[in-house]
Amino acid sequence: TDKDWNTIIRYFQYIDSEKISYRGEFAFDNNSTEYHAGEKLHELGACNNCHFYGEEFPTQEASTWAPNLALTKERLNPEWVKEWLRDPQAIMPGTKMPAPYLPDKDILAMDGAEDDWGEELVKLGGDSTAMLNGLRDYLWDIKGKTNIDATIKEYFDENGYEFGAEEDDFEGEDDWGDDEDW
């Protein structure tokens, strides 16, 4: 939600002692080894399972949906994105967002690693900072419509607002415990 994103933004502003949100244009090289390694990490991580890309819907059901990645460059500081990717749970405990798997140098040195991980990731030799830089740069380059409120509303108007119930759900209980606990 916007509230969650604004909480994350305020957190990063706080740790950076930043009072203003304006930042100059972030430049990256979309032909670099880091960028292409980030693209591969993105592909392997299946970010599109949960995240929107402009008006492109996630591949999983609505209960797993996460923010529109086309908003990354509009809302966030590039360094914040790296820290978020490094350990989302440290910043927002309980978030569904997993940290991306970053293969270490031993994994990338194995026979067949280039086939599994791609040439660019192998070239980085397990450098996690370079991998996170590349993933951040790739996310920064995602294009698409940023305000998709009407698209999402239309989806729910057509498909309803119900999320699938668990088989073990009881009458009057949601997936977070008894309603009276709230």
Predicted feature residues:
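Gly/Gly-Pro-rich "capping" loops immediately C-terminal to redox-active cysteine motifs
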Residues: 1, 52-84, 96-110
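C-terminal capping alpha-helices of c-type cytochrome domains
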Residues: 1-28, 101-173
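C-terminal, active-site-flanking charged/polar segments
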Residues: 5, 15-17, 71-83, 88-94, ...
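Detector for the c-type heme attachment site
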Residues: 10-17, 43-44, 49-57, 74, ...
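Short helix-capping and inter-helix turn/linker motifs at the boundaries of alpha-helical repeat units
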Residues: 25-29, 57-60, 72, 126
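Sequence/structural segment immediately N-terminal to covalent heme-attachment motifs in c-type
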Residues: 30-54, 130, 148-151
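Long, ordered, helix-rich scaffold segments
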Residues: 31-35, 41, 70-74, 99-100, ...
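Long, low-complexity, intrinsically disordered segments
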Residues: 171-182
